[in-house]
Structures are given as C-alpha cells and as structure tokens.
C-alpha cells in the first residue's frame, strides 16, 4: 500500500473556457478520488495548472488579436475560478508560463531535455516540414489542418487526430491547410530533434502488461495497440517563438522551443517542486513525491491525452532515468452535448457562448455546483462517450437528488425536529430490522470506498444512491408517524437509526458532492469538514441536531435552457 499519493489532472490549455467535457474527463474524477483518499487518511498532493505554451496559445492570440502572454494569463484566471466554483480543489494550480512558476518549469523542462539528449535518445535530423509561404513561417501541430491519414477525419491537426486519437505525421496529412492564412501548405526543410520512441517499445510493453487488471481497458488496449503497430520517432522541438527554448549550444537550435507535449507533463513535476518550495522551504523536496517507490503517481486525463501519458511521457521518464513511472493513468472518453435530441461536440466555434455546458455559464445561473458534479459523475464517460443532456439533467436532479437522497434526509430530520425537540432520540429499543439497516449502511460504505479506490466513480455513485433509496424504503416500512402514537420507544429507535444512516450518507457524499456533505454535517450538528472514511459511531442520545434545510433544490423544466 502506498504511503503517499501524487494525483495529477491534465493541464488545460489556457486558451479557452472550461466546459462539462473537460470537467467530466479529468478534473472531477481526480478531485473525487483525492477527497476519498484524504478522508481515508492518506497523505495526498493534488497537482494541476494551465498549459500556457505552444501552438494552441499562439493560434488563440492570433485569432483574438492579442499576445500569448495575455491569452495565457486571462484564461488561467478564468479556469481557476471555474474550478473553485465547482469545489475542485488543487494543492497547487500552476501555469507553465505563469510568472510564479515559469522559472522552475523552464529549469525542469530544459534539464529533462538535456539529460535525454546526453543519453543519446534523440536523433537530430534535417527534415521536411509544412510551411506557410504567405505567413513566412513553419506550421507545426495545430497550425495546420487536413484529412487524417489514419481514419479520414477531415479536420485533423498536425500532431494528433481528435477523432481516432492517433498521432499524426504532418507530411501524410491530405490537403493540409494553414490555420493562419487558409492557404495550402508547402514543404520546406528544417532541423529538429526526434525522440526515438522505438527504443522504449519493449520496456513500455512490459510495464503496460504489468498493469493488466489494474488499469482501464481503454488505456491499455490503445497503448499496447500503438506499440504493436510500432512507435514512430516524435519531434520534440518546434519552429515557433512561444515556449521553452531548446537548451542546446547548437546553431540549428536557435529560435526553436520544446514541443508542448514534451514540457506539459513536466509541469506536474515543476508545480510539485513549486509547492514544496512554498510549503517545505526546498523545491528539491519534490523527490519525495516523484522519486520514491512508496509514492503512487496517478494521472487523470481525457481520452485524447492517452497517447502522451501512456507512451510518450513514460518513455521520457525512462530516458531520464530518475523519476518513478506512473502507477496509473486514468482516462475518460469524450462527453458531447445533446441539443434538440442531436449529439454535438462542444466547441468554442460551434457551441453557443451562453450554453450551460460552459462551467462559467452554469455557475452564473446560480445553479448548484453539487448537482453538476452529481450529473457529470452519473454520466461519466468511463467506458464510452456520453452526452450532457440539459433535460436529463433536470430529470435526474429532481428524481434522484431531490426525491431520493434529499427526501429521506428531510423526512427524518424534520421528524426529529418536530417530535424529539431537535435532538437524537433514545436508540435503546432498536430492533433486528434497525440493526440490519445499519449493516446495509456498513456494506454501502465499503462498496463505495472500493469503487473509489479502483477509479470506478460512476459505480460508486450508483452504490450511494442505491443506499439512499434503501433509506427511504426503511423509513416507509418502519412508519415512525404510526409508532409515535402507540410505541414511542420504537419510534425513537427508528429516528435514531435514520440519523445514524444520514451520518453514513454524509461520509459517502463527501467525495462526490462536498457541499451536500457539509450541509448534512451541519444538520447533524457536526463540524462541517470533519469527514473520515470510516463507519460513524452511533449518535449519542440527546445530542442536539442542527436545523433541517433543503438539501437539493427542485428544478423547473428548461432550467438549463
């Protein structure tokens, strides 16, 4: 069992707002996992930050008639606010070009490149690259679009096809067009440094095969399939101005920067070092998290990042030789948007700016962050692509959160407030039925915990809601409104059992819906942040309870537009 956990969530490009697909893909499951680990008593660091370098930022700067610095800073702050609004709480939210983090990040990135270069894993090669003669510049990565040479998708970029997820060889793109001018790209010569991924095929295969039965099949099948096809060389330098300068004393390296997918995952490490500098006084304490066999390193990503986190990044770590390989790479699929019954990809160019799929817009409407966290977990694209359906969101909020979980809590606590002076009644007359119900609570807590530990968040939430429905059934069968009239001791035992059950629910809610968990704690008269993943002790008779409040608000049809 690891003594520590280092959990990362994929760095979002700081060139756009966050949408529900981003949240469901990497950030919400990571936050859910971290909350569970901490409640279970583990030492955890949760690392994320904005990906400020590379082509995506340059393109946005051109489109918005701004500078890369301004784009990165602007969206970094907006994304940080979105995360805070959903209570996705990182220990550090850095930025690869943020003033507070850029120096350490460049140090780590350039040191990585230098070590890999010294190890002889790069091939320096004069090569042909796509070029925009009108703009007078080369067209790396997203600066060019064309038809994917793997699957035929018509808007593949020069580094990866978002339809099939495979890496792209830019010169094999059909009908390549410059994103800058729209003109057909031509071919010119330049020099770049290529990481020979083929050198790592055998150790990567062995490492991945050792994860069988531990990792999700979608990650393993994709990565092992890529190795079976043969891993290509990948250029780790680019002909652009915005990024980490290539740290070589070589005339051919002048004016070049590191490929964004070389330096981006290093951000996990540099941000950890920044946290250590701030909280432990020494940035080199990052080794406690990255170079120690007793620390588990868990990466949460979207499906389009699988190739980088399951192949390229581990190969870089192997070439470097020091840091630990990831313990797990947890990848989710894409989440689309259902509009008028039709599935649409969420996109800055095609999705309405005020659509509630943008986190910023959802929060502006004053809607419950926990309701969104619930729905995105219930619809989590863990094994296949799913969709955010505003109508289904309202239906599930009302029929599940309100009618099941919220209803039981309200029934039990308002009964205690009305008939037992807002205190825990005497459980002395508990029956076998009451004890059996609490045994179900123990089992539910165990099942939810097992699901969370295994990154099966959707199943964990299903177990929580299954127990909430059991609680409603228990309340109805025990009928305290009836026993109050002829057997007050039995009525008291029923309500005491319900209060104990709500304590279980508060614990199980914490990773998924922290706001709801705090509300439950307050209604139970407990400190709002004292959550431990362990069976709660029976509440003491006479303990004062808090005031019952509505746990979840009912939504009207069309509440999300």
Where are these regions (language model features)?
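Active-site-proximal binding-pocket segments
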Residues: 306, 376-379, 383, 389-392, ...
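Amphipathic, non-membrane alpha-helical segments in soluble helical-bundle scaffolds
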Residues: 47, 69, 255, 259, ...
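Structured secondary-structure scaffolds
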Residues: 2-41, 45-48, 98-100, 104-107, ...
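Cys/His-rich microdomains that often coordinate metals
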Residues: 139, 155-156, 168, 185
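A broadly conserved sequence feature marking short terminus-proximal activation segments
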Residues: 78-155
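A non-catalytic, amphipathic alpha-helix used as a structural packing/dimerization or gating element
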Residues: 32, 70-81, 111, 404-411, ...
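Basic, alpha-helical terminal appendages of large translation-related enzymes
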Residues: 1-4, 45, 125-130, 134, ...
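A charged helix-plus-loop insertion that forms the helical arch/lid used to bind
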Residues: 60-73
